[in-house]
Amino acid sequence: MENLDALVSQALEAVERAEDINALEQIRVQYLGKKGELTQVMKTLGNLPAEERPKVGALINDAKERVTEVLNARKAAFEEAELSARLAAECIDVTLPGRGQATGGLHPITRTLERIEQFFTHIGYGIAEGPEVEDDYHNFEALNIPGHHPARAMHDTFYFNANMLLRTHTSPVQVRTMESTQPPIRIVCPGRVYRCDSDITHSPMFHQVEGLLIDRDINFADLKGTIEEFLRVFFEKELAVRFRPSFFPFTEPSAEVDIQCVMCSGKGCRVCKQTGWLEVLGCGMVHPNVLRMSGIDPEEFQGFAFGMGAERLAMLRYGVNDLRLFFDNDLRFLAQFR
């Protein structure tokens, strides 16, 4: 057994001298592997008398367990040191300044639409939406727009075929609402509309908000009061407002609404072309023909409608002189509206 003790001592010394896990693995194979030195000692038990085998076998197993225990402890120490070194190398200094993130914001047109919707929902209107690809009937015919009207011309409207087109206003949403809903009706219809037009104040795609109110005993004074209060709240100013007689096929009487120029306070400037007034929207009492075609009796119900371009209002509110800036995706421009 002296040889066994010497063998164990050699193994333990080798473990202590090991410099890494690979060296430990070589020691394990040398002493505990299938052909290891302690394994070979175990194989000599067959040469001993039967009465000595249990005692010697227990000593050999104890020796193997001692070596295994020291090996595992040394291996765990190496693994812990390796993990600590890796964590130290990969650690993040949380005191370092961050890279910084650019804060986004709502697009000025989105802000304008939300501002319009907020006012009208506050006074009891609902929000209605409809398809942007519309049929000729709902876009023109049901709105009392005859076949010879200039708006039906190819140079003003995007047609897919003789019957389908990109809507030129959100009025079809009003028609569809009147067809499916009995009065009283109070809605605003925000959405994208399309027209063959592109210059400093026009875009082939723009955003429009139209409003509709249908009920008994509605008159022009109701329309006038609604529009004046909306403009006061939207621009946050006490602006002079005037209603000019105009013509729209779907309203009678019709009017254009002007406000005192927000740039010069009515004194006259380049924006208002020295007139002191700016046109902001169109409106009128819903034409009896439109009510009839939507299944509403004009003898019992009356209503008013109005429509405004969100881009036009945004230009006036924010002092933007070129509508195309809203759609150029220039972050330098858009960042001003955060």
Swiss-Prot record:
Mg(2+) binds at residue 252. Its main location: cytoplasm. It catalyses: tRNA(Phe) + L-phenylalanine + ATP = L-phenylalanyl-tRNA(Phe) + AMP + diphosphate + H(+). GO terms for cellular component: cytoplasm. Binds 2 magnesium ions per tetramer. One of its GO terms (biological process) is phenylalanyl-tRNA aminoacylation. Its EC number is 6.1.1.20. Its cofactor is Mg(2+). GO terms for molecular function: ATP binding; magnesium ion binding; phenylalanine-tRNA ligase activity; tRNA binding. CDD domains: PheRS_alpha_core. It is an enzyme of class 6 (ligase). It is found in: Cytoplasm. The keyword Heme does not apply. Keywords: Aminoacyl-tRNA synthetase, ATP-binding, Cytoplasm, Ligase, Magnesium, Metal-binding, Nucleotide-binding, Protein biosynthesis. Belongs to the class-II aminoacyl-tRNA synthetase family. Phe-tRNA synthetase alpha subunit type 1 subfamily. Tetramer of two alpha and two beta subunits. This is Phenylalanine--tRNA ligase alpha subunit.
